[in-house]
Regions:
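Rossmann-fold NAD(P)-binding glycine/threonine-rich loop
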Residues: 85-101, 113-120
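Local beta-strand N-terminus motif with an aromatic residue
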Residues: 31, 54-55, 141
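N-terminal Rossmann-like NAD(P) cofactor-binding module of classical short-chain dehydrogenase/reductase
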Residues: 56-59, 82
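Mid-domain Rossmann-like dinucleotide-binding core that forms the NAD(H)/NADP(H) cofactor-binding site
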Residues: 1-40
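C-terminal hydrophobic helical "lid"/dimerization subdomain
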Residues: 69-70, 77, 113-164
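ADP-ribose/adenylate-binding Rossmann-like module
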Residues: 75-90, 104-108
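A generic alpha-to-beta junction signature in SAM-dependent methyltransferases
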Residues: 50, 62, 74-76
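Short amphipathic alpha-helix with an adjacent loop that forms part of the alpha/beta core around
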Residues: 41-52
Length: 164
């Protein structure tokens, strides 16, 4: 959200299933709108938010069949789907939908060294708010991993080896 805004995105939309995470996306990271998949129909919400145009750039951080299918449905004409990282099972992509929309797909896992330098510069300048927001002792690793798997961690957890 933050980087998209800094690069000139006029409207950013966070999509997810957890009210707390969507609230964080809006309040902390500047999402203009949110779609809660447990309460709203994705395509209807995106049409309402975008005035029927769809989304120019969809960043899919889940990358599974459901997320890729949903992402291609909400893409605008000539939009770009950016697959970030890898999911568990290979995702099936409907080429007809992409061709009809003249959309494209880009896969990435980290970014280039140049992009990493830009990101570090943005963080140093104070223009980015950190995602790491819960500090833990090393002996809490099992509890933190359990909470992470259960989707109970908002943002990112990190371990401080000097924390007693």
């Amino acid at each position: 959200m933050q980087i998209a805004k800094l690069l000139g995105a006029t409207t950013t939309i966070a999509i997810g299933r957890t009210a707390e995470k969507l609230q964080m996306a809006q309040e902390r990271f500047g999402a203009d709108a949110t779609v809660n998949l447990t309460r709203e129909k994705l395509t209807d919400s995106i049409k309402r938010i975008t005035g029927g145009k769809g989304i120019n750039a969809v960043f899919d951080f889940v990358v599974n069949n459901e997320s890729v299918e949903n992402s291609t449905k909400i893409l605008a004409n000539a939009g770009r789907l950016i697959l970030v990282g890898i999911g568990g099972e290979p995702a099936v992509i409907n080429p007809k939908r992409l061709t009809f929309k003249e959309a494209s797909i880009l896969g990435t896992n980290v970014g280039s060294k140049h992009e990493l330098r830009l990101l570090v510069d943005l963080a140093r300048s104070g223009k980015l708010k950190g995602v790491a927001n819960t500090k833990h002792r090393l002996n809490e690793v099992n509890e933190v991993l359990t909470a992470l798997k259960a989707g109970k961690i908002l943002g990112r957890a990190y371990f401080d080896p000097f924390l007693k």
